[in-house]
């Protein structure tokens, strides 16, 4: 294991810093916004703005990377994301924060693309599963840790924003100092929803509706916790418990889905998450009950994306893996744009519990659709399924695939930039007439 992970340790360390800073922002910004008197709708719009930027980054950041190269593009996007964090502390105004979240979402999508392209390039058929699984474990672990860092400093001060900026800035150090050669293949996004729907309707509709429900939690989950009587520390703990529960459940649920109809298992998870959501939204709240129900909700709701992504891989041709991954991720992102706004409107009407009443409604609609599809279309035999892959079905980026990227694929490109110099190697002399890239 050490021999396999050693060459990518720098990348994983960069991921840990990057995602810790991101997780801190997901909790810090709703907490500070509530203390500043932002309306629930304004906070929901902030959550949606992040996913607007994320979808935009999925679509357009590949062109930035092709133009500048992996390391320079990575450095530029980290710099912009770091500046955006600090600007939150300077300009405390809802529309400004929403615009800054768009910038952050765009940069994070591009950073995912760079990191995952390197990991894909460094992984071989023998160690791909270990490399990608390590990446996902670091990802979830860093986000959960970052959420709890909000308890270190008073939210009213500059310190938590400075800490988030420091973490983001540190992410660049192990990456720019890595001896890994670039360039690595990157993927472009082609979104053909009708093509995906004809082959796997549950995958398209499921990723969109799950994006609505899960995006609502990411956007205003902390606001729900505060409105339910938790203090800032317990609100951060609540958010971390939900995410940690979802992370722990991903692999066992995914492996279970290899043995049964994924749609049936998804329906069972949806039924359980609806029950947990209704309990969170309607029952009297105590710290213990909220944490327990939050754990149940995370266990049942967050792995849903992995199931619909795996279902999409089952139904789509193997040669369209890149397009399939991008299509499911963009549908999830589109749902995540709507979710926080609609949930915040529900909360404004019925109170904090409206968040989970909204998630239950979205999941209920999806449950009805999944049951209908399971009745009209027979399940695939186990032998015809694509084995569940934790990394390829996580809602992180569209570039991770179960096989190495095919550079002849029209959706795959290699930046035309020189590789990073290797140790003890002299850089190639530049010709006088060579244009500066």
Question: PLM features: residue spans?
Answer:
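Helix-to-loop junctions at the C-terminal end of transmembrane segments
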Residues: 57-70, 154, 249-261, 347-348
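Helix-breaking motifs and short loop linkers at transmembrane-helix boundaries and internal kinks
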Residues: 69, 90-95, 261, 283-285
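C-terminal transmembrane helical hairpin of 12-TM major facilitator-type secondary transporters
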Residues: 263-306
């Amino acid at each position: 294991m050490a021999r396999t992970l050693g060459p990518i340790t720098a990348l994983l360390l960069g991921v840990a810093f990057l995602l810790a800073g991101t997780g801190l922002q997901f909790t810090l910004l709703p907490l500070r916004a509530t203390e500043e008197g932002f309306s629930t709708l304004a906070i929901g719009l902030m959550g949606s703005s992040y996913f607007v930027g994320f979808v935009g980054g999925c679509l357009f950041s590949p062109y930035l990377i092709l133009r500048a190269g992996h390391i320079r593009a990575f450095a530029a996007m980290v710099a912009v994301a770091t500046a955006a964090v600090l600007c939150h502390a300077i300009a405390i105004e809802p529309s400004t924060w929403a615009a800054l979240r768009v910038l952050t979402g765009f940069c994070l999508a591009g950073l995912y693309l760079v990191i995952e392209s390197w990991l894909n390039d460094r992984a071989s058929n023998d160690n791909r599963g270990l490399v990608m699984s390590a990446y996902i474990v670091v990802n979830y672990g860093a986000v959960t840790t970052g959420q709890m860092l909000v308890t270190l400093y008073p939210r009213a001060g500059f310190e938590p924003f400075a800490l988030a900026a420091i973490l983001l800035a540190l992410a660049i150090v192990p990456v720019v100092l890595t001896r890994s050669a670039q360039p690595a293949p990157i993927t472009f996004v082609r979104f053909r929803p009708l093509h995906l729907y004809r082959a796997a309707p549950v995958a398209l509709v499921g990723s969109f509706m799950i994006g609505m429900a899960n995006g609502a939690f990411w956007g205003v989950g902390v606001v729900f916790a505060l409105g339910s009587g938790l203090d800032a520390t317990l609100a951060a703990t609540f958010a971390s418990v939900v995410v940690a529960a979802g992370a722990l459940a991903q692999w066992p649920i995914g492996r279970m889905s290899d043995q049964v109809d994924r749609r049936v298992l998804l329906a069972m998870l949806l039924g359980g998450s609806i029950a947990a959501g209704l309990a969170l939204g309607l029952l009297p709240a105590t710290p213990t009950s909220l944490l327990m129900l939050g754990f149940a909700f995370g266990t049942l709701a967050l792995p849903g994306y992995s199931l619909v992504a795996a279902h999409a891989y089952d139904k789509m041709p193997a040669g369209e893996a890149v397009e399939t991954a991008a299509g499911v991720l963009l549908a999830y992102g589109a749902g995540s744009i709507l979710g926080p706004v609609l949930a915040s409107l529900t909360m404004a009407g019925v109170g904090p519990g409206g968040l989970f009443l909204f998630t239950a409604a979205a999941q209920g609609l999806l449950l009805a659709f999944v049951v209908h599809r399971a009745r009209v279309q027979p399940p695939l035999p186990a032998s015809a399924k694509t084995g569940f892959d934790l990394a390829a079905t996580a809602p992180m980026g569209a570039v991770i695939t179960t096989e190495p990227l095919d550079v002849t694929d029209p959706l795959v490109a290699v930046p035309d930039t020189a590789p990073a110099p290797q140790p003890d190697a002299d850089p190639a002399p530049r010709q006088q007439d060579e244009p500066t890239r």
